[in-house]
Amino acid sequence: NTASTGAGDLSQLLMSYFKMIFHFDFIKFYSMLHIVKEKKHEMIALIELSGEMEAQISMVYFREYLPCYIIPEFWNEKDQKRYTATQMYHPLIADPVKNDVDQKSCMLLTGSNASGKSTFLKMVALNALLAQSICTVCADFYQAAFYRIYSSMALRDSLSEGDSYFIVEIKSMKRIFDAVKASDIPVLCTIDEVLRGTNTAERIGASTELLKALSKQGVLCFAATHDMELTTYLKDVYDNYHFEEMVDGDQISFPYRLVNGPSRGRNAIRLLEAFGFDREITDNAHRLAEKLTGEQT
């Protein structure tokens, strides 16, 4: 073993001297570079083919992972923006609740906290993106336009850019409005809690006009809000839907089923009760909420 190791070290040493004297590595490198230049187009085609195969394999794996999926259908009419899907679900949720969607006009979504509004918006946008990219939709049926997809969800303030939360919201909305002007291709947008970074009166006023303007400009908008006033102000241009909650004593559960019409329930204080906050806090909160509701009406 020692002799063979010594012979190996000697051969490696001689090879190193050989490379240093005759520049063998450089000669080989430039030889390969010459081949690459000659076969440049073939190599680019090979790389593109390899990438396409990897994408197709990934798509097949994704489809195998899904409990069910459908190949999407798209409208031929350029002015058709309708979004239709049956038994649609979010692919990243285990044992998801499926919902139907059939919208040719905008949707305003209300409902209590944790009832499923944000997840529904993500489901709508994500499945449209999957349909337009890998021809795969998590539903039993899907037919829609080919959209430019935008969202204003899960926003955060930016310390690096010096933007407050409200400024980030404004920029996000402006991005959607600018997109509408940039092309004739229909825009699909999802908006979660419009302008929640400001006071109630201005939020309701600005949200009403912003959402109304999106509808007038032909955008297919799915928006979620806790401001029940919007369901009245926008009833002529937005279809009202909501998610319900089921209350049993101190326990609250959610069926996650889309229901026609605006929400009439409130559960924020009930959730405080369910998580064990002092009764004095929740009772006083109930009384104050009822007083404020009475003043608004």
Across the structure, where does each feature detected by a protein language model lie?
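Alpha-helical bundle segments enriched in helix-capping/polar residues
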Residues: 1-105, 297
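ATPase nucleotide-binding head domains, primarily ABC-like/P-loop NTPase cores
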Residues: 59, 66-297
